[in-house]
Regions:
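Enriched for short, Lys/Arg-rich terminal
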Residues: 75-103
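Generic alpha-helical structural context detector
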Residues: 20, 40-43, 86
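Short proline/glycine- and basic residue-enriched helix-capping loop/turn segments at helix->loop/beta transitions
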Residues: 46-47
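Basic/aromatic recognition patch in beta-strand/loop cores that engages polyanionic ligands
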Residues: 40, 50-82
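Arg/Lys-rich, positively charged N-terminal/basic patches that mediate binding to nucleic acids
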Residues: 1-37
Length: 103
């Protein structure tokens, strides 16, 4: 976790699943590299940098960024760390899973 974002329980579980899957299929070195890229992507999005897409039409304040093969969704907060709500693979049914996560 970084000072500029907090992984909510669902996003933390998503990240653990990504780590397990990547380690199983591509090994430890690739896992470290991929997770480091994801962390940089999350930090940039939380700081309002990079190619962040405004998803407020779906949920107030929601932001999304694509990082490698995953979409990361977060809710920026005033004077508090951004809340990362989900990290979904590009082949998942993003909107259905996101709707479940934002309930």
């Amino acid at each position: 976790m970084s000072a500029n974002y907090t992984l909510l329980a669902g996003a933390e579980e998503d990240l653990r699943d990504i780590i397990r899957y990547t380690r199983k299929h591509w090994g430890t070195a690739q896992t470290r590299s991929y997770v480091a890229k994801m962390q940089r992507g999350i930090e940039a999005m939380a700081a309002g940098q990079g190619l962040v897409r405004d998803m407020s039409a779906l949920y107030p304040g929601l932001r999304m960024v694509k990082c490698e093969h995953h979409y990361i969704f977060c809710l920026p907060q005033n004077d508090a760390p951004a809340l990362v709500v989900a990290i979904f693979h590009e082949k998942m049914n993003l909107m259905t899973r996101l709707a479940d996560r934002l309930k």
